[in-house]
């Protein structure tokens, strides 16, 4: 993949998620045809119960955990041939 241009897609969001939703989203990012060649995704979003959900994803593995409260949710996706429109739909933005 050395010849592919790596870009990043980032958004701030007040959208509320469940831990299950975040896990499903991260699993979906493995679909290269749909979303692009995703190398990394990370961020923090507000959880349904008022907690904050932090997530990290690299191809083949991801982690979802709770963490310190933040002012606003932030999502960052890094990869090649990123389909921004499909990412916005996936994250419900």
Language model: regions and residue ranges:
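Flexible loop/N-cap segments at domain edges
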Residues: 77
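C-terminal accessory "lid"/substrate-recognition subdomains
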Residues: 1-70, 80-93
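Conserved nucleotide- and phosphate/pyrophosphate-binding catalytic cores
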Residues: 73
């Amino acid at each position: 993949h050395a010849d592919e241009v790596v870009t990043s897609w980032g958004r701030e969001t007040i959208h509320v998620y469940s831990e299950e939703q975040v896990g499903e989203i991260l699993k979906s990012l493995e679909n290269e045809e749909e979303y692009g060649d995703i190398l990394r995704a990370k961020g923090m979003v507000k959880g349904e119960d008022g907690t904050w959900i932090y997530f990290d994803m690299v191809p083949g593995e991801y982690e979802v955990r709770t963490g310190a409260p933040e002012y606003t949710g932030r999502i960052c996706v890094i990869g090649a041939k990123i389909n921004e429109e499909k990412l916005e739909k996936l994250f419900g933005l």
